Swiss-Prot record:
EC number: 2.7.4.8
UniProt similarity note: Belongs to the guanylate kinase family.
UniProt superkingdom: Bacteria
Catalytic activity: GMP + ATP = GDP + ADP
Molecular function GO labels: ATP binding; guanylate kinase activity
Lineage: Bacteria, Pseudomonadati, Pseudomonadota, Gammaproteobacteria, Alteromonadales
Gene3D superfamilies in UniProt: Guanylate Kinase phosphate binding domain (3.30.63.10), P-loop containing nucleotide triphosphate hydrolases (3.40.50.300)
Domain Guanylate kinase-like: 5-184
InterPro entries: GK/Ca_channel_bsu, Guanylate_kin-like_dom, Guanylate_kinase, Guanylate_kinase_CS, P-loop_NTPase
Subcellular location, record wording: Cytoplasm
GO terms under cellular component: cytosol
Pfam families membership: Guanylate_kin (PF00625)
Name of the protein: Guanylate kinase
């Protein structure tokens, strides 16, 4: 019997390494894990593929999905809408596949309200100085933009207590191992094992 997959909410301030950790976790395309593909109204960027990076829809289509209660969570960011499909998540979880939501604390609160069993993981940088170094090191933004992102990062980090697990991304390999350990631990809970090993348990306890 296939155990239901777990829903992991992964949040972090910009520069904490969240996207890199998720990419490393899934680089070998494991059959039992996948990242949720969000819907968005923004235009595709060069190289982005519809259905792989995002589900690209227009504003009218997105608002129709909101009216249908089709999203676990949705938000408007810089004039564009983003949302997580309720149907896709539920279907994937019933197949025994763990799903990762790469969303902020506001989205996490929305998901937790409808699926309290979702597992929250917050990624932190080892220090404020290191976070600023990472943001500056990208070499793509002005000081004003970096200052704005730092302020936004501090605001985001203030919600770390709302999550079930906290990973400090000081050493990348250690942080990745920590993330894998969290996933493994959730697959070994009593509820998960009872479901996954139902036939074996019945056989062991047969009179």
């Amino acid at each position: 019997m296939t155990a239901r997959g777990n829903l992991f909410i992964v949040s972090a301030p910009s520069g904490a390494g969240k996207s890199s950790l998720i990419s490393a976790l899934l680089k070998d395309k494991p059959a039992d894990m996948q990242v949720s593909v969000s819907h968005t109204t923004r235009a595709p960027r060069p190289g982005e593929i519809n259905g792989q990076h995002y589900h690209f829809v227009n504003v009218e289509e997105f608002k129709a999905l909101i009216a249908q209660n089709a999203f676990f969570e949705w938000a408007e960011v810089f004039g564009n809408y983003y949302g997580t499909s309720r149907h896709v998540i539920e279907h994937t979880l019933t197949q025994g596949i763990d799903v990762f939501l790469d969303i902020d604390w506001q989205g996490a609160q929305q998901v937790k309200a409808v699926m309290p069993e979702a597992i929250g993981v917050f990624i932190l940088p080892p220090s404020r100085d290191e976070l600023e170094r990472r943001l500056t090191g990208r070499g793509q933004d002005s000081k004003d933009v970096i200052d704005s992102r730092m302020a936004q990062a501090v605001s985001e980090m203030s919600h770390y207590k709302e999550y079930d697990f906290i990973i400090v991304n000081d050493d990348f390999d250690t942080a990745l191992a920590d993330l894998r350990a969290i996933i493994r631990s959730q697959r070994l809970t009593g509820a998960s094992q009872i479901h996954a090993q139902n036939d074996m348990l019945n056989d062991l306890l047969a009179g």
